[in-house]
Regions:
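UBC/E2-like fold recognition across ubiquitin and ubiquitin-like conjugation systems
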Residues: 1-63, 73-183
Length: 183
């Protein structure tokens, strides 16, 4: 019942954010998987821009793939979250494991875990924890990057505008004769 409720909340979250949270795959029966193997995986695609390397903001990763592993004692035991696409972040280990912090409560649903992951990958300063660093190189880079380009963070407010070709408009496009009767 709890896992079904979590999946419903993930679907509601996805709808509320314009399908920027996609449930890519899960096993057919999460409860059976946990009972038989001791864990189950929920795979997500988060369509929020993030930092794939030190080359940000020149290079932006638009989608982040995440695997959330639920152990047999879930929800009493915190889920384990791992990013499987490149990310350069102070609170994400080089292996991709996310440092979610120590705030886990069994009453917390997976939707709240996903919201926290979104805050992490978008460099939301309300959740960025430089006191408990998983990647010191990323922290040093981030400190310099935010000084150089403070508007590039959080990454979800920084959108890359693709150059577009201008549509030529001239007065010759307007009809030269307009009658007094409007036609």
């Amino acid at each position: 019942a709890r896992l079904d409720e979590d999946l419903r909340k993930i679907e509601a979250l996805s709808k509320s954010v314009g399908r920027r949270v996609l449930l890519k795959s899960k096993t057919d029966n999460l409860v059976d998987d946990i009972m038989l193997t001791g864990s189950c995986n929920v795979r997500l695609a988060l369509k929020y821009p993030t930092v794939p390397s030190r080359q940000y903001p020149k290079k932006v990763q638009k989608t982040t793939d995440v695997v959330v592993k639920l152990l047999s004692r879930y929800p009493l035991v915190e889920p384990i979250a791992e990013i499987t696409t490149p990310i350069f972040h102070p609170n994400v280990y080089a292996s991709g494991k996310i440092c979610l912090g120590t705030k886990w409560l069994p009453s917390e649903g997976l939707d709240l875990v996903i919201k926290r992951i979104i805050q992490i990958i978008t460099f939301d300063d309300t959740i960025l924890n430089d006191a408990s660093v998983a990647n010191r190189h990323a922290l040093n880079w981030y400190r310099g990057a935010i000084k150089r380009d403070p508007l590039a963070f959080p990454t979800d407010v920084f959108e890359i505008i693709e150059p577009q070709s201008a549509i030529p408009v001239s007065w010759s496009d307007v009809p030269s004769e307009v009658s007094a009767t409007g036609g």
